[in-house]
């Protein structure tokens, strides 16, 4: 399995979180995948991204992004490195496109499917992360559950459901003691959507 992971570890607010997420995913898939990792500096160079996804030896590929996002696509250094209305050819050979990014499901996810990606998973609203260390795992565990399910040959639909169940477990554990964090997790859970063929197995 070919897996492209992007991370914006240099981001001032969430760089450490994006890096931790990418490290967890890399560890889960390291024994079963051909992984290419593009970090902040490489994402600032359009040519590097283009060469990676157009490499004939790297298709089909799965794409997991841990960067900021907007309706049109994914962001590094306040600029889109992928998005709607350009680089349509990138997604012709994409299997699963997953974004841990704000808003990218609104337009970009649908665009990726239209251009040929088999499946997209991401958020249709702005997502929030509590950055204090004591809260970190509440936000990471649903991601981990999703990725572990994929690695165990569950289809995307079931894997998303596993992530949402984990979100609910985290919410329930906080509901009586920290209503604010529980409400943030609830919003993140409910904004997680899936487009395309959710029956695919990686």
Question: Where are the regions a protein language model picked out?
Answer:
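Short acidic, S/G/P-rich loop/turn micro-motifs used as interaction or catalytic elements
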Residues: 9-14, 43-45, 68-74, 103-106, ...
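Well-ordered, non-membrane alpha-helical segments in soluble/globular domains
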Residues: 17-25, 46-50, 77-85, 139, ...
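Active-site-proximal C-terminal subdomain of hydrolase catalytic domains
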Residues: 105-202
